[in-house]
Amino acid sequence: MNPLTVAHALKKEEEDLLQQAGVPYHALSFTEIVPLTIDWPGGHFDYLVISSPQVVQCLLEEKPPYPHLLLVVVGEKSAARLKKAGYTVVHQAARGALLSDFFQRHCKECYLFIKGDRGGSDILTLWQHLKINYREVIAYRLLLTPYPLNVQPGALVFFSPAAIECFLQVQGIINVPVYCIGPTTAAALPQGILA
């Protein structure tokens, strides 16, 4: 049986689950996170929007200079970490596209979107459609770190569009079953490849 290749650095609990299930796997990280110094903009913001665990880490290391900031967060674990650190999370969803109802109800407010240099496009597209007032701040860069696989995978699991992009730079083609975590990742697959 060819191993499952996971294009993501696995957490301990994810590794444990695969081992308990008896699934042979390789975990590969095709990306590197490079934190940036955040240049906090002046002005008033009603909500701070957090869409990735990397931004959560940035906020835990560098507190924003805005008192009484209300957070809108993508991800249950991210919301829990921020609440534990003393932040006020007023709304949380599993992915950015699911925040649509909240943004429609609060379309007159001003938002600060802290994000990486990739991703977040579903939120930005919605805001532009709703004519929402926002500022965007880049907290980290996501570098692609392509390298060839030394083993023929039995299947691939992708956690991000960047991992798919990086994999294709080196491998050129995907000829095994593919599993994607989330619809945004699945949408990044080339035409003709089903997840």
Task: Label each region the model flagged.
Residues 1-195:
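Signature of uroporphyrinogen-III synthase
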